[in-house]
Curated annotation (Swiss-Prot):
Induction summary: (Microbial infection) West Nile virus infection does not affect expression levels.
Role: Putative protein tyrosine-protein phosphatase.
Tyrosine-protein phosphatase domain location: 656-921, 944-1196
Upper lineage: Eukaryota, Metazoa, Ecdysozoa, Arthropoda, Hexapoda
InterPro entries from the UniProt entry: FN3_dom (IPR003961), FN3_sf (IPR036116), Ig-like_dom_sf (IPR036179), Ig-like_fold (IPR013783), Ig_sub (IPR003599), Prot-tyrosine_phosphatase-like (IPR029021), PTP_cat (IPR000242), RTP_Phos/Ushers (IPR050713)
Organism of derivation: Aedes aegypti (Yellowfever mosquito)
Name of this chain's protein: Putative receptor-type tyrosine-protein phosphatase mosPTP-1
Length: 1309
């Protein structure tokens, strides 16, 4: 039942309270002469005076004895009513009837201390045994009344009740003015004493109005007289007001489509006090927006009040629906909440009236009308044609701006003559291809090829005998021959038309009526009747014209030059054939010898239509369709790839399982020799026993003089890329015993890029050994490797290494050094595959693009050099195939490269990840935007809107929100913006307290680190301590506050300087508060209560960020925040806005993208925005949010310097290293450079590429960071440089490059 408070607007009686403010005893003396004696008097004496006293109960009152003064002689005195009250006899003590009563000795007045209402009476004072008093004393003592009787409920409705009660038993000498009625809501509620009801009169009846339906009430009554309020009566018996239809609306939280025919709606119920009856459930009504009649409305009743979501099915495709949700109780329905939701695009129906308009030998022109049911926004039409079971796709035809039922035409060209084609046309939307319409058509014939003339001789002096062979190529039949001849003295030909028979191979005829001793030119061509229009004759090509002089017994005129060319050509062909046969013989012999020596195991399938096995990888065309395990698989157009991947995902990824099993099955059947890997001297060079290098594709190290042959071995294989043989070298993570071999391979193969996709240790197991120097230079055999710089980013690190061959001859000294770049991906999880493919795609693109065109292969390794290595190589090849051909063949390429190194793409999970990553790559396209192109995209609404839709496409499931949706945590959330389970920030849990590890906060990555930011809502009063617990637990020393505190919903959650805040484990106090450039900076210290540890925290409050009117201030604020963070780079930056949404995430985005722009002059807005959405869905509400990020980036100043203080690196020589505190760092580094009180050195520095460009000795050492170098000289010329160490650059080292002393403010040496 409802327990809502009583309506404040209920009607009440007019307030007529009586009030007496008695500050002392009120005595009213009235002396009057009465003509008749009162019936209650003790003395029935006429005309006796009466003295009246009126008193208030609880106060003192004194009655004077009439006629007695201080000078009166009193022997006896008696005060009495109906009984004696006090008595006095001369010489004795006064006698009184009550301890409250005193007989005053001065004038024998009767004193009551205090007086009660029961003391009301008529008193007489008899002196010296008189029979009658001088006057009667009338005492009236007034008091608050007794409580009325229990109120009774006479009748009631949903909002009123009629009450009646018994009057008070004793009004206590003061009439009842009115009554006060107090109300209680619920069986155990509080009485409403602050705002009770007042009656207008002293009637014992009242109608209470303004009640809440279906609510438990009880009442009590208080009587009111001039003296005040009586005690409350007994409360009435409980009753429940009648029901009414609900007044509250549900609140819609989610409304989106789930398919082309269904939508999903979720809601929160209205407040319980608005249900006004038993909560029976919900009614959902819906209709298409464009259909406004009541007949079209459909309804669904959900008779379960706990349900808060529903999916509506069987809707029309791509249609806007108005859906209304109402609660209902037994009295009826509440007001509706209406939401507009649209079903998804579906499959368009068949195009109408597909037919053939025109046909030629190489073209077919078709026409059609748009489908009857569009089921979406038609983007265009795809035209396929099938020939000999091979399907080909013509380019999509974009939809023209035409009226409904417009006619489309399209011409298929480059077809083969006289060939049957099945033509398929299907409309397509953004998401689906529609149902196809089909038509079959045979192309027309083309003209026959030229006949071959075999005879031209004189038949007589007036006739020629002319013979020819049937054309080598013709279609259907040859119906006619046309012989053309002319006298060379005339330019015009004469034609003779013969009916032909295709079954006759050689035809001869006599050309009559010629002139003797004339030269004639004769040629012939065939002709065929069109199969489309039999009346049309299609002419073929002419034979080569032949010349002859007509005379008796003549011969064909020789043509020396042409004949000579023909003979020379024949000789060349003959010579080429002989040479080719000889070369082929050598190849066969070489192959047999090689097979005998190395036992190569190449096999070829006997069935020509099927694919060659993967064991012929060097010979097969992996881009062509082929049949494997009874299924034909081939390249897939990019427009079809997402649909293809979705089909593989159905039924628990069964399609992927089948494909991967087919690849695995081939690998088991193929046996490639790997004798060098199995050699006893080489087994120790293999990290894993079962991961070996095939002999036919392995990398051979160059022979060192005097070295055994097997010492040319390294566990590495050449692997082809897309249309580039030996594009990669796949290898294992180097072992300590193979470091020298690894670097020899890098040198000999002219490698410029090394790709590493593993961490050194994963899940406690050694995956790879550190084969590069941590600082300075190391020797690995004959190769010296020096670490030049190290750029650490969130998901990968780029190291610049200088390698030098120490054994090259002096004349080649200039070629003995070169730079190698190691791209080290650090975010591949220990188990499985990455959460999202975007960082991997970006890494693949960046690392492969860095390889110079004249460099050797890219070396790729993980731990074994097969799983992640194969994934990387397949992704690169497919991205290039997409760019080149607009299609891709993952299955075929993986089969192909598995013949070059075993186990590439080691798990089915990796195989699935490749497909999902390529779908993302196709959908998103190129997302790295160059700096000079950002401004042009701000007004490209279509581009930004498309990005926004892709960015926000992910919708979390309830399992992803387990902690956030728990009832114990629901009160900690301000809005529907809540953290996902995989990215939420955890607090230290309190034993036995459910939900104590929860706070509405999410981890977000930045440019440098995966956990660079914590985004959270403005704390609620219930979560103040949780917020500071998070800061304490995660060592967060920088807080950015983008919301402002008010006195209503968003309260101040930090302590003032005079009032510290305490928790069970720590104490927070404010140290200072200052204003800087439109923002406030506060410094806090959090001290541990249990041990000697404290944490300094700085808060930057800037509720006006971003100030679009002053773009420079946007970046200055970000720089200021990151400067502070650079001083104490242990924990994340905590970013707070009202709901942990757009503003906070925008700050993180802008900060990270500004660093990326400084680093490589590109910005990947799409990647940051999408990964942020995937960790905290709902932060981007419209495409304008994304557009504003582009707009802010377009204002970025070139001299920002945001990267300068985030990380300092240097090349190390033989300098001594000592640890420095963050305070020393802040003294040395300010705003990204060495502080001015440390003098800059003058020596050599770095060029823009981080390579030392000078040779100074006492000057600045090369430092990397902003691309320039600075060193500081201190005290007696010593030089100091600073380096950030540690996995997250959270250790600071100071390097003293000379023997001079370094004086520090701290106690360090």
């Amino acid at each position: 039942m409802n327990s809502a408070p009583r309506n404040a607007g209920a009607a009440r009686s007019v307030d007529r309270r009586g009030f007496i403010a008695a500050c002392g005893l009120l005595v009213l003396l009235v002396v009057r002469m009465l003509g008749a004696a009162d019936a209650t008097r003790i003395f029935d004496i006429e005309n006796i005076p009466v003295v009246k006293y009126v008193a208030v109960a609880g106060r003192n009152v004194t009655l004077n004895c009439p006629g007695v003064t201080e000078h009166s002689l009193v022997d006896t005195l008696v005060w009495r009513t109906s009984q004696t009250i006090a008595e006095y006899v001369d010489g004795g003590l006064p006698l009184v009837s009550s301890l409250r009563i005193t007989l005053l000795p001065d004038n024998f007045s009767l004193h009551f201390n205090p007086a009660f209402a029961s003391d009301t009476d008529e008193y007489s004072c008899l002196v010296n045994d008189r029979h009658s008093p001088d006057a009667l004393v009338d005492l009236l003592v007034q008091d608050v009344p007794d409580p009325p009787g229990r109120p009774l409920v006479l009748s009631f409705t949903s909002r009123t009740v009629n009450l009646s009660w018994a009057y008070t038993q004793d009004p206590r000498n003061a009439p009842i003015n009115n009554f006060v009625i107090e109300t209680r809501v619920g069986e155990n509620g509080e009485w409403d004493q602050v705002d009770p009801l007042y009656t207008n009169s002293n009637e014992a009846f009242y109608q209470v109005t303004g009640l809440v339906p279906f609510t438990v009430y009880s009442f009590r009554v208080i009587a009111v007289n001039e003296l005040g309020h009586s005690p409350p009566s007994k409360e009435s018996y409980y009753f429940v007001t009648l029901r009414e239809a609900p007044t509250g609306k549900p609140v819609t939280t989610i409304a989106h489509n789930t398919s082309a025919t269904s939508v999903y709606i979720s809601w929160k119920p209205p407040p319980a006090e608005t249900i006004l009856g038993e909560f029976l459930g919900y009614r959902i009504t819906y209709r298409a927006r464009d259909k406004g009649t009541d007949d079209d409305v459909k309804e669904i009743y959900i008779r379960d009040s706990t349900v808060e979501s529903h999916e509506i099915h069987h809707l029309e495709t791509y249609t806007q629906y108005l859906a209304s949700i109402q609660v209902f109780n037994p009295e009826g329905l509440g007001p509706p909440t209406t939401v507009l939701v649209m079903t998804d695009e579906g499959v368009p129906s068949k195009p109408l009236n597909l037919s053939v308009l025109e046909v030629t030998s190489t073209t077919i022109k078709i026409t059609w009308r748009e489908p009857e049911k569009l089921n979406g926004a038609i983007h265009g039409y795809r035209v396929y044609y099938v020939h000999q079971n091979q399907t080909l796709l013509h380019l999509p035809i974009l939809k023209a701006d035409a009226a409904v039922n417009s006619v489309y035409t399209y011409t298929l060209s480059n077809l083969k003559p006289y060939t049957d084609y099945k033509i398929i046309v299907a409309a397509f939307t953004k998401k689906f291809d529609g149902e196809p319409s089909e038509v079959s058509q045979r192309t027309d014939i083309s003209g026959p090829s030229a006949p071959k003339v075999v005879n031209l001789t004189c038949h007589s002096q007036h006739e020629l005998l002319f013979g020819w062979h049937i054309p080598q190529t013709y279609y259907n039949t040859i119906d006619y021959y046309i012989i053309s001849y002319r006298n060379l003295e005339h330019s015009e030909y004469k034609d003779i038309r013969l009916t032909a028979n295709s079954s006759i191979v050689e035809t001869s005829m006599i050309i009559p009526n010629l002139t003797t001793n004339m030269v004639y030119e004769v040629k012939v061509r065939a002709a065929s009747a069109s199969v489309i229009n039999p009346k049309q004759i299609i002419l073929g090509s002419y034979s080569e014209p032949k010349k002859i002089s007509l005379q008796l017994h003549c011969e064909k005129i020789p043509q020396p030059s042409q004949r000579q060319v023909y003979d020379d050509y024949n000789l060349a062909v003959l010579g080429g054939i002989v040479f080719s046969c000889f070369g082929l013989l050598l190849i066969v012999l070489s192959f047999l010898l090689w097979k005998k020596c190395f036992h190569a195991a190449y096999y070829y399938l006997d069935d020509p239509p099927a694919c060659q096995g993967a064991n012929t990888a060097g010979l097969i065309d992996w881009e062509a369709p082929c049949e494997v395990a009874g299924e034909v698989r081939g390249p897939i157009p990019v427009t079809e790839f997402a649909k293809h991947v979705a089909s593989l995902h159905v039924d628990g990824d069964i399609g992927f399982s089948k494909e991967y099993e087919a690849i695995q099955g081939e690998a088991l059947n193929d046996e490639y020799p790997s004798e060098h890997s199995q050699h006893p001297d080489n087994k120790g060079k293999n990290r894993y026993l079962n991961v070996i290098a095939y002999d036919h594709s392995r990398v051979h190290l160059r022979q060192v003089p005097g070295q055994k042959k097997h010492l040319d071995y390294i566990n590495a294989n050449y692997i082809d890329g897309y249309q580039r043989p030996r594009s990669f070298i796949g290898t294992q993570g180097p072992l300590p015993g193979t470091f020298d071999c690894f670097w020899r391979m890098i040198w000999e193969q002219r490698v410029a890029i090394i790709v590493m996709i593993t961490n050194l240790v994963e899940r406690g197991r050694r995956k790879c050994d550190m084969y590069w120097p941590k600082d300075g230079a190391e020797m690995y055999g004959v190769i010296q490797v020096r670490l030049i710089r190290e750029d650490v980013m969130a998901t990968y690190t780029v190291r610049t290494l200088q390698i030098k061959h120490t054994k090259l001859k002096k004349k080649k000294a200039s070629q003995s050094e070169k730079l190698v770049y190691q791209y080290h991906y650090t975010n591949w999880p220990d188990h499985g595959t990455p959460d999202h493919p975007l960082p991997v795609i970006n890494f693949v693109k960046k690392s492969t693009a860095a390889n110079p065109s004249d460099a050797g292969p890219i070396v790729v390794h993980c731990s074994a050099g097969v799983g992640r290595t194969g994934t990387y190589i397949v992704l690169d090849a497919m991205l290039k195939q997409i760019e080149s051909k607009g299609m891709l063949n993952v299955f075929g390429f993986l089969r192909y490269i598995r013949a070059q190194r075993n186990y590439l793409v080691q798990t089915e999970e990796q195989y699935i990840f490749i497909h999902d990553a390529l779908v993302e790559a196709i959908d998103s396209g190129e997302t790295n935007i160059k700096m000079d192109a950002i401004g042009g995209l701000v007004n490209n609404i279509d581009f930004i809107d498309n990005q926004y839709k892709l960015i926000t496409s992910y919708q979390p499931k309830e399992i992803n929100l387990t902690s956030a949706l728990k009832s114990v945590n629901a009160i900690k959330n301000r809005s529907s913006l809540v953290p996902l389970e995989g990215s939420r920030v955890h607090l230290t849990p309190k034993p036995g307290v459910e939900g104590s590890d929860y706070i509405n906060a999410s981890w977000l990555h930045g440019f440098r680190r995966l956990r660079d930011f914590v985004v959270t809502q403005h704390p609620l009063i219930e979560t103040f301590k949780d917020f500071w617990q998070m800061v304490w637990d995660h060592n967060a020393q920088t807080v950015v506050l983008l919301s402002s505190a008010d006195n209503m919903s968003f309260l101040q959650f930090w302590p003032n300087e005079s009032e510290p805040m305490e928790s069970d484990y720590y104490r927070i106090r404010m140290v200072s508060e200052t204003s800087e450039n439109n923002y406030i900076v506060r410094n806090f210290v959090i001290q541990s209560i249990q041990d000697d540890y404290e944490l300094s925290v700085r808060m930057f409050e800037n509720p006006m960020w971003p100030d679009m009117a002053n773009p420079r201030s946007i970046y200055d604020f970000a720089v200021r925040v990151h400067e502070r963070c650079a001083q104490y780079r242990n924990g994340p930056i905590v970013v707070v806005d009202r709901y942990g949404g757009f503003q906070a995430c925008q700050f993180c985005c802008i900060s990270s993208l500004a660093m990326q722009l400084e680093y490589d002059q590109t910005a990947n807005v799409y990647t940051y925005a999408k990964l942020y959405h995937n960790k905290r869905p709902g932060i981007w509400s419209s495409y304008e949010d994304i557009r504003q990020i582009y707009r802010i980036l377009s204002y970025m100043p070139k001299d920002l310097g945001l990267l300068k203080c985030t990380e300092l690196r240097t090349e190390f020589d033989d300098a001594a290293i000592m640890t420095a505190t963050p305070d020393l760092y802040s003294k040395i580094c300010s705003n990204g450079s060495i502080n001015t009180h440390l003098n800059s050195g003058d020596g050599g520095g770095n060029g823009n590429d981080g390579v030392p460009t000078g040779n100074g000795t006492n000057g600045g050492l090369p430092m990397s960071g902003g691309g320039t170098t600075t060193a500081a000289t201190i005290q007696n010329g010593g030089t100091v440089i600073v380096k950030m160490n540690g996995e997250d650059n959270d250790e600071l080292s100071v390097v003293v490059a000379t023997s001079n002393h370094l004086n520090l403010d701290h106690n360090q040496s």
